[in-house]
């Protein structure tokens, strides 16, 4: 999306060279034939041989480029996954491990780059040496064939070879660009040819042709069509208009796959799916777009105030809007980073409701909201504003089942039971498991109220790129020691080239009858030696540039990578992933393959033009007179052009990141976009962003043409003046042969002048990538990972006591305090429940405990150790946590359980058996090496959460934190998790952000937070004795909701 497209775009600059090069070569051969006769055949044969050598080299280079792109893909995929889950890595103290993973992938990419550059060095050596080789072979052939090499013939030949130099010298870049663009085009073509969603998976009917809104007949569906076991099988379903259908079942039973089959997202193996009416979809994992809350709710629809207010009220968002300074116009960070899980869930429910669809597919819509909000959502939204709509909702919360017209109980991908709530209870064949102790209600989620702008605009430099940027780049490797050697090698090449041509012009006889000054054999031997020396200088120069450029790129990458990994979470909250990925892909690619070459070309072209001016001034010093005003004009044009081009290039670079960001967001929400039939709108938005990027880029190209035209005019003027001067000089003033040599060099002057300015501007353009990478190499860092003189004991924390003393936390100096004067103590080995309304500060307390945010005042002491005095790795690696985001990483089950490779297979299997995943993993052919795709999409949400449980079972920390860890799993799985935690962490400290009542009641102590302060802190029993306590009110609220189940449960006895 970034590098491949950019390479194809860059190739446009070289398109004309493809057809111009053969014309230039054959035109040169024709001119040679006129002056050297049959000797020109030698030039033709040698040229064809050089070109033939390029064919195998080009094929090999294409393979290397393909390897580079594959290695880059692996690195970028890992980088993207890490950036999305950086909070998990920091909480688990895995950041160093995953940093090393990216470094390993970069090492693989580096090896591929080095192979490619070595081959490119060899290709450059051949092609830059080609003009000299062709001239030597041609002159030797002429000598052997008896062709007289007069001064006129030699100068004509040298002029022809001089004309060939520029296109042949540019051939390595042309071939490199051709190969890179071909590889990129093939990769894009391969991507475009991949299979798409089945277009005939769902039959859409009008309401007049069927009485059912949703109908599935003999359906079988699979996420992996090649698997012998379908994900869903024998599905028979008929849903009439206006019905409310609840879907429940255990973890991995196929609950979420059923709505996907109705949407056509899962591969249909057999059967028929018919849908009548407009659909709206709410996924299990909230998908939130960057932008305002209102934009997310409207989702492209027209704003209607009355309809909007009804929607917002039905989705219980009024109070949330009051928490924000800008209400529903508050900006949402990337992936809703500054919103709680409950808020994100309600926003996407509001998005669905506002669409006024006929059919609503809600995948676990109540899991992330508190008990009070859940009741409001169900009554006001599902049974209120959507009362006449067809609704299919997945849920594991049994209190929402009795109101359903139909309940589907899923097991192993099949509908095992179907009917109304009372009917299923009477059947007494397993449904009652879902109703056991139905105390699984959410109490609250967390919100971080921030007044300032969350997502910061990209910082761009203004004006001239600072000298320190150039200096940093040039001196990064060995203090810049390679730079003078590179310039020396190019200078030697230029001097040897001039010397060889001067030698031929000076020694060649003026006429066929004249006697040469030296024997022709000796003349050609000296010429060949000088040409060989110049070719060796080219080889030395290309090797030094490759070594210096790639080493510098690697150093810059390493610094940027370490800087990003050590950045605090506030950086990731305010910086879109697309912006960081743009640095790690497009900008890093410039450093890898282009930056050193572009800077080198600047030096080379300047040295070439200095050499040309030197030769012309040796012929007639008067030529220098015209060079002075021309040089002034060139500098004027360059200074007039460069600032414009530089700012346009910066604008183009800045506009590229939103394209990547929008593409990534669209990819993540593709199912929702298709369900809402919003594909055209997102494609249009993407095209608008592409236009915004292309607009400044087009002006960059136009400005370049503007400059080239004026420089060419100046060059032709200088050349014309030189010719007139040489013709008008009196006879005998200068050697005619040397004058001819001056004219020969003057022929390339117009190209060289344009090349110098173009290379300077192009290098400055590419230097912007260096500037941006340097910005990301200087991100303020977190506290040190390890402080050697403050390291805790190996068995710390052995008691598990946690003491908060006057703790205050704010997310930035200009943000309001989120936690205010928190003072309390969690005794070691006790179970602590933390509850509170939205925005009370629960999750912030946990983040402060792990130092994801640093206290602005006060201390946190664990087992008599002030955690702000020790290293972050020492702190985080000693604490265990099951976070709300159950992230799995691309790889295997083994990698996800034990990324640090600390445990044996036996210990891993024990942990899997304890968390009820042992049999599931054993059923896989790969066992512990079973595949986990990106984000763990091939595992259910519940299974992902059990894997997270397996991690803490292996870690065996004396302090365990549960941050709404079971919000998205069914009652049975939640019971399993609670049972395991009670058994395995019996004498250890467990801090639970409570989302279900029974986890709080069974705690030893309950901490109630309100508006960032401690409202209550005592045992559940004592809090319940106080009827006015916040905790008592929560229990009463839950009891009122649960009373109507009592009668139903009696049917089971």
From Swiss-Prot:
Taxonomic source organism: Arabidopsis thaliana
Protein name: Putative ABC transporter C family member 15
Subcellular location(s) of the protein: Membrane
Main location: membrane
Record field: transmembrane: 11-31, 36-56, 125-145, 151-171, 481-503, 523-543, 595-615, 714-734, 738-758
GO molecular function, one term: ATPase-coupled transmembrane transporter activity
Reactions this protein catalyses: ATP + H2O + xenobioticSide 1 = ADP + phosphate + xenobioticSide 2
Keywords, alphabetical: ATP-binding, Membrane, Nucleotide-binding, Repeat, Translocase, Transmembrane, Transmembrane helix, Transport
CDD domains, sorted: ABC_6TM_ABCC_D1 (cd18579), ABC_6TM_ABCC_D2 (cd18580), ABCC_MRP_domain1 (cd03250), ABCC_MRP_domain2 (cd03244)
CC terms in the record's Gene Ontology section: membrane
């Amino acid at each position: 999306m970034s590098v491949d497209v950019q390479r194809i775009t860059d190739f446009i600059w070289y398109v004309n060279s493809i057809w111009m090069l053969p014309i230039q070569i054959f035109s040169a051969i024709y001119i040679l034939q006129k002056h050297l006769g049959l000797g020109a055949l030698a030039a033709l044969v040698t040229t064809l041989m050089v070109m033939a050598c390029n064919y195998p080299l080009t094929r090999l280079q294409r393979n290397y480029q393909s390897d580079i792109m594959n290695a880059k893909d692996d690195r970028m995929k890992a980088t993207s996954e890490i950036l999305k889950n950086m909070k998990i890595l920091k909480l688990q103290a895995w950041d160093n491990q995953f940093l090393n993973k990216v470094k390993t992938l970069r090492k693989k990419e580096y090896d591929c780059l080095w192979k490619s550059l070595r081959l490119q060095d060899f290709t450059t050596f051949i092609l830059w040496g080609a003009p000299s080789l062709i001239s030597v072979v041609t002159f030797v052939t002429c000598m052997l064939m008896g062709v007289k090499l007069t001064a006129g013939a030699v100068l004509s030949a040298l002029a022809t070879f001089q004309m060939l130099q520029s296109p042949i010298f540019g051939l390595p870049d042309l071939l490199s660009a051709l190969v890179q663009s071909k590889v990129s085009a093939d990769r894009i073509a391969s991507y475009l040819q991949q299979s798409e969603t089945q277009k005939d998976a769902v039959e859409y009917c009008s309401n007049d042709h069927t009485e059912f809104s949703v109908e599935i007949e003999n359906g079988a569906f699979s996420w992996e069509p090649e698997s012998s076991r379908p994900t869903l099988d024998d599905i028979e379903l008929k849903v009439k208009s206006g019905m409310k259908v609840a879907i429940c079942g255990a973890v991995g039973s196929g609950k979420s796959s059923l709505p996907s089959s109705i949407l056509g997202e899962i591969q249909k193996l057999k059967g028929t799916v018919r849908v009548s009416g407009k659909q709206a979809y709410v996924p299990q994992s909230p998908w939130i777009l960057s932008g305002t809350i209102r934009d997310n709710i409207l989702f492209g629809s027209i704003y209607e105030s009355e309809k909007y207010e009804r929607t917002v009220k039905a989705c219980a968002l009024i109070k949330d809007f009051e928490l924000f300074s800008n209400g529903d116009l508050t900006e949402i960070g990337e992936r809703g980073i500054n919103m709680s899980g409950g808020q994100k869930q309600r926003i996407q429910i509001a998005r669905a409701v506002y669409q006024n669809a006929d059919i609503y597919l809600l995948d676990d819509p109540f899991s992330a909201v508190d008990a009070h909000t859940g009741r409001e959502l169900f009554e006001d939204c599902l049974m209120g504003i959507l009362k006449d709509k067809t609704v299919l909702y997945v849920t594991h919360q049994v209190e929402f089942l009795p109101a359903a017209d139909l309940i589907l109980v899923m097991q192993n991908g099949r509908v095992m039971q179907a009917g109304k709530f009372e009917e299923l209870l009477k059947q007494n064949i397993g449904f009652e498991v879902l109703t056991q102790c139905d105390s699984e209600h959410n109490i609250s989620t967390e919100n971080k109220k921030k007044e300032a702008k969350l997502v910061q605009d990209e910082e761009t430099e203004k004006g001239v790129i600072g000298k320190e940027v150039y200096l940093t780049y040039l001196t990064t490797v060995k203090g810049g020691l390679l730079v003078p050697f590179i310039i020396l090698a190019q200078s030697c090449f230029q001097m040897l080239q001039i010397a060889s041509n001067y030698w031929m012009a000076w020694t060649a006889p003026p006429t066929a009858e004249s006697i040469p000054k030296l024997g022709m054999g000796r003349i050609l031997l000296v010429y060949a030696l000088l040409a060989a020396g110049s070719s060796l200088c080219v080889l030395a120069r290309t090797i030094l540039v490759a070594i210096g450029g790639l080493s510098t790129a690697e150093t810059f990458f390493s610094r940027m990578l370490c800087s990003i990994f050590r950045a605090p979470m506030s950086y990731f909250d305010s910086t879109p992933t697309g912006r960081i990925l743009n640095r790690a892909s497009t900008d890093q690619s410039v450093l890898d393959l282009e930056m050193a070459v572009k800077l080198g070309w600047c030096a080379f072209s300047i040295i070439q033009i200095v050499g040309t001016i030197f030769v012309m001034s040796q012929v007639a010093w008067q030529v220098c007179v015209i060079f002075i005003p021309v040089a002034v004009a060139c500098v004027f044009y360059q200074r007039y052009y460069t600032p414009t081009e530089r700012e346009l290039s910066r604008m183009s670079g800045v506009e590229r990141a939103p394209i990547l960001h929008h593409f990534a967001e669209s990819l993540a929400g593709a199912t929702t976009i298709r369900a809402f039939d919003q594909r055209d709108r997102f494609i249009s938005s993407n095209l608008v962003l592409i236009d915004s990027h292309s607009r400044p880029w087009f002006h960059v190209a136009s400005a370049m043409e503007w400059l080239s035209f004026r420089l060419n005019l100046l060059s032709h003027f200088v050349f014309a003046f030189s010719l007139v001067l040489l013709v008008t000089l009196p006879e005998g003033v200068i050697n005619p042969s040397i004058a001819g040599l001056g004219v020969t060099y003057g022929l390339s002057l117009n190209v060289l002048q344009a090349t110098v300015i173009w290379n300077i501007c192009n290098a400055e353009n590419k230097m912007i990538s260096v500037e941006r990478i340097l910005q990301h190499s200087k991100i303020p860092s977190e506290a040190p990972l390890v402080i050697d003189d403050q390291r805790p004991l190996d068995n710390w924390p052995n008691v598990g006591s946690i003491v908060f003393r006057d703790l205050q936390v704010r997310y930035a100096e200009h943000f309001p305090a989120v936690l205010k004067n928190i003072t309390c103590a969690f005794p070691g080995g006790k179970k602590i429940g933390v509850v509170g309304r939205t925005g009370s500060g629960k999750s912030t307390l946990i983040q402060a405990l792990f130092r994801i945010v640093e206290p602005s005042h006060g201390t946190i002491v664990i087992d008599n150790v002030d955690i702000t005095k020790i290293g972050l790795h020492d702190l985080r690696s000693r604490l265990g946590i099951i976070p709300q985001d159950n992230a799995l990483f691309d790889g295997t089950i083994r990698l996800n359980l034990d990324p640090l490779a600390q445990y044996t297979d036996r210990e891993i299997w024990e942990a899997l058996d304890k968390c009820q995943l042992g049999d599931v993993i054993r059923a896989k052919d790969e066992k512990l090496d079973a595949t986990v795709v990106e984000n763990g999409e091939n595992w259910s949400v519940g299974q992902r959460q059990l894997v997270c449980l397996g991690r803490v079972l292996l870690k065996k920390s004396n302090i365990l934190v549960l941050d709404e860890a079971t919000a998205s799993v069914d009652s049975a799985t939640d019971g399993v998790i609670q049972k395991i935690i009670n058994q395995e962490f019996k004498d250890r400290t467990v801090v639970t952000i409570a989302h279900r009542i029974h986890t709080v009641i069974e705690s030893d102590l309950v901490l109630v937070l309100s508006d960032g302060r401690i409202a209550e802190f005592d045992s559940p029993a004592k809090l319940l004795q106080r009827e006015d306590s916040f905790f008592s009110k929560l229990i009463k609220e839950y009891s009122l909701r649960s009373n109507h189940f009592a009668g139903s449960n009696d049917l089971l006895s």
